[in-house]
Amino acid sequence: GSALTPERSQQILDSGLTRIRFSFDAFTPGTYSKVRVGSLPLDRVIRNVETFLELKEKGNYKLPVVGVSFCKVKQNEHEVEDFIKFWQPKVDLISIQKFMPPTTNKEKYKKYYASDQYNELPVTEFKCVQPFQRFVFRNEFMYPCCVSFNKDLKLGSIKNTNIYDAWHSPKMNEIREMHKNGKFYEMKTCKDCVNLIYPPSEKLKNSTQKEA
């Protein structure tokens, strides 16, 4: 939302875009300045998004579907409810997301985990929707999701692989089938991802280590 201007907002509305989401990750200016370091002041970003919504309403645009997102971490978790109450009457959807570290080093990013992100029970079944929804391109390579810690999810290079063929490839179908059956643990990246998003509590981690 910080890059929005009335002119850009109008261009987006006229472009035929079907979905757009604005990330805030905070409700108060103080918290916003801590989690969104270097951004414009929060009130200005909110005003930008509200202008976008006003233009959409005045122009009777049905699309795009407008959402706002909030990545919950220890530093902002106390503002989730206020964030939802503020935006609920204004937008089509609100996404409250769990923190995902940029690497598999959980200990390094432990200080960011929200208090309710830890699991008292091990995650035994998880079905990811991303392989059914999207492709992600990173450094010319195609992936079935936004997580690419390891090479096991790499589906080929855009330079020599047709997108249609990659989308319908045996590997892509295998990943989808795996998640349909809740067997995320059969693929290293998927297993690492679930363990990072749903980390075990210290109590669970200790009991698991004792059993081992």
What are these language model-derived features?
Residues 128-131:
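Short, small/polar residue-rich loop motifs at catalytic or cofactor-binding pockets
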